[in-house]
């Protein structure tokens, strides 16, 4: 059962990519009240067809069985694993794409096997993960299938199966940190004014374990650096690190302390009794990139921390309550000859979910929306339960839920951009939503790496906050910043929420899109005098990241200029289509 469900989920996310990125090869056929998805391969590669249980205007479709593959050998029924291979091998058949196909086949295979193992390991938890009350760490470790429009959302390129089980959140993992003593001349650290230093935070969390680690060290001035255990093993093979260890300038102290728990990003680690989280460097290929903290990204935590303390944010929050920023105000790493050693840098994030708040009913948005076979989504369960308790129709409760989501997400996220030019890559894994009595009441944004602003806004921001965004290289042209905000916050999170509500059968997407359109026009009237972002959200097409094409091109979305990190393309905008429907109603 778990193998079948994992293959079904993998095929679904792959076909969602295909429908979005290769629309000229896709047809939706309706016969006798049944909808069918048909994919025609180029260069006489045949076709693949299967039932479509739900077609979403936002791209979050649901598919059924059987799957039929037709080519020169005739038509035959294939299972989901065979269908995945056929799609990858036949969709881009050119010689130039061969390496990309091989890489994608391997990653998709890896992702599917991890989902299968996670479904098996967490089978007894799946119902509770869709319950009314879910803690931060439970939700973080309960995102089983991941990104619904990505060909390999759970690949862990570089990790063995045993390592994945030990270090991945899907297996409810927890493990102690690996520690290195670093000669203080090499140790590089910083923190925002007003924030605890990295050393202060570590001492608070580790207590006597710090003293035990330092006791056997040789005479000299050393600082302690926590490293992800998997990353530590890899870095010891690095010639620069190996030389420092051989010279006694870095000392491997082994694992020590209480277990830390990986969150949905795999590399960010949480402890319910610590006042901070650790965003580790992790040289593992996850979705579209290897997750290593870059020097400029360490400084973006200071940008967010300073902005959050400033009157600009305080005044904005009074106008748009509901959004909390979670900065990473401290960092540490190893610096030699003036350059950070990639792979050893650690960013330290404030932890609002500690102590009495560890059991707070909060969840990353992706886990709320995730639809699993035989279970559906937590979103659907919450709304069905509220409709039952309130004795109101499902569609009315779903609209109320979405209205509250518009208030706490769309207004502050896009309002901040319209007023101050600050964009956040607020996709569904970077947003944590707080639930009370079944409804969303507040949001937390994390991930300083995706916190930047455009050049036109820079003058006013730097006047209020000298140097803002400059050392962190967080100032970009308005066009690429618009593009990132449109994809991560609008397409991924907002339209993703529309699709999640629609595919649960709770309410029509057309009704939700009409609500969204009204909200965007209202926001534009209030804040949008100097920006065209709302017009772009209402345009006939949207600039959208193409995860399948990005993977076929073997691009790393965290490497290179912002403008060239991923493949982007134009997709049909469901909001524009809704406007046409309403205009002719």
UniProtKB/Swiss-Prot annotation:
InterPro entries registered for this protein in UniProt: Aerobactin_biosyn_IucA/IucC_N (IPR007310), IucA/IucC-like_C (IPR022770), LucA/IucC-like (IPR037455)
Entry keyword Oxidoreductase: no
Keywords recorded for this protein, A-Z: Plasmid
Gene of this entry: rhbC
Family named by the database record: Belongs to the IucA/IucC family.
Biochemical pathway: Siderophore biosynthesis; rhizobactin biosynthesis
Protein species of origin: Rhizobium meliloti (strain 1021)
GO MF: acid-amino acid ligase activity
GO annotation terms (biological process): rhizobactin 1021 biosynthetic process; siderophore biosynthetic process
Superkingdom of this protein's organism: Bacteria
Name of the protein described by the UniProt record: Rhizobactin siderophore biosynthesis protein RhbC
């Amino acid at each position: 059962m778990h193998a079948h469900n994992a293959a079904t989920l993998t095929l679904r996310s792959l076909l969602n990519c295909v429908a979005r990125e290769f629309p000229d090869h896709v047809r939706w056929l309706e016969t006798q009240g049944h909808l069918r998805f048909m994919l025609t391969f180029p260069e006489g590669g045949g076709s693949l067809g299967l039932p479509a249980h739900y077609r979403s205007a936002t791209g979050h479709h649901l598919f059924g069985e059987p799957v039929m593959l037709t080519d020169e050998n005739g038509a035959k029924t294939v299972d989901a694993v065979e269908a995945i291979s056929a799609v990858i091998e036949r969709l881009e058949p050119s010689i130039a794409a061969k390496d990309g196909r091989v890489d994608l086949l391997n990653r998709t295979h890896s992702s599917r096997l991890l989902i299968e193992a996670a479904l098996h390991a967490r089978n007894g938890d799946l119902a509770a993960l869709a319950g009314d009350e879910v803690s931060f760490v439970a939700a973080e470790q309960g995102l089983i299938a991941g990104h619904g429009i990505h060909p390999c959302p759970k690949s862990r390129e570089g990790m063995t199966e045993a390592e994945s089980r030990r270090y991945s959140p899907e297996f409810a993992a927890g493990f102690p940190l690996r520690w290195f003593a670093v000669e203080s001349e090499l140790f590089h650290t910083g923190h925002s004014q007003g924030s605890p230093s990295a050393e202060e935070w570590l001492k608070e969390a580790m207590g006597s374990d710090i003293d035990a680690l330092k006791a056997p060290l040789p005479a000299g001035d050393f600082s302690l650096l926590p490293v992800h255990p998997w990353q530590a093993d890899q870095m010891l093979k690095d010639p620069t690190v190996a030389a420092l260890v051989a010279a006694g300038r870095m000392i491997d102290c082994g694992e020590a302390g209480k277990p830390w728990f990986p969150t949905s990003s795999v590399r960010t680690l949480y402890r319910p009794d610590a006042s901070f989280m650790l965003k580790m460097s992790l040289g593992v290929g996850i979705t579209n990139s290897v997750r290593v903290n870059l020097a400029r990204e360490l400084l973006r935590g200071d940008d967010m921390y300073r902005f959050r303390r400033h009157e600009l944010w305080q005044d904005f929050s009074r106008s748009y309550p509901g959004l909390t920023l979670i900065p990473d105000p401290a960092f540490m790493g190893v610096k030699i000859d003036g350059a950070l050693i990639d792979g050893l840098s650690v960013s330290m994030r404030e932890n609002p979910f500690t102590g009495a708040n560890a059991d707070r009913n909060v969840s990353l948005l992706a886990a709320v929306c995730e639809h699993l076979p035989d279970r559906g989504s937590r979103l659907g369960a919450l709304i069905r339960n509220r409709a039952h308790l309130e004795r109101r129709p499902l569609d009315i409760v779903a609209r109320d839920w979405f209205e509250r989501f518009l208030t706490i997400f769309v207004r502050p996220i896009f309002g901040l951009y319209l007023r101050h030019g600050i964009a956040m890559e607020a996709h569904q894994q970077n947003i944590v939503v707080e639930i009370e009595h079944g409804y969303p009441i507040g949001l937390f944004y994390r991930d300083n790496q995706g916190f930047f602003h455009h050049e036109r806004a820079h003058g006013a921001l730097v006047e209020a906050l000298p140097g803002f965004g400059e050392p962190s290289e967080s100032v970009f042209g308005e066009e690429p910043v618009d593009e990132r905000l449109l994809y991560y916050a609008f397409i991924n999170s907002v339209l993703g929420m529309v699709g999640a509500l629609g595919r649960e059968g709770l309410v029509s997407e057309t009704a939700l899109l009409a609500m969204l359109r009204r909200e965007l026009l209202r926001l534009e009237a209030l804040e949008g005098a100097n920006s065209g972002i709302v017009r772009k959200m209402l345009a006939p097409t949207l600039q959208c990241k193409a995860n399948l094409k990005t993977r076929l091109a073997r691009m790393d979305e965290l490497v290179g200029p912002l403008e060239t990190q991923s493949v982007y393309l134009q997709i049909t905008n469901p909001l524009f289509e809704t406007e046409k429907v309403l205009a002719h109603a």
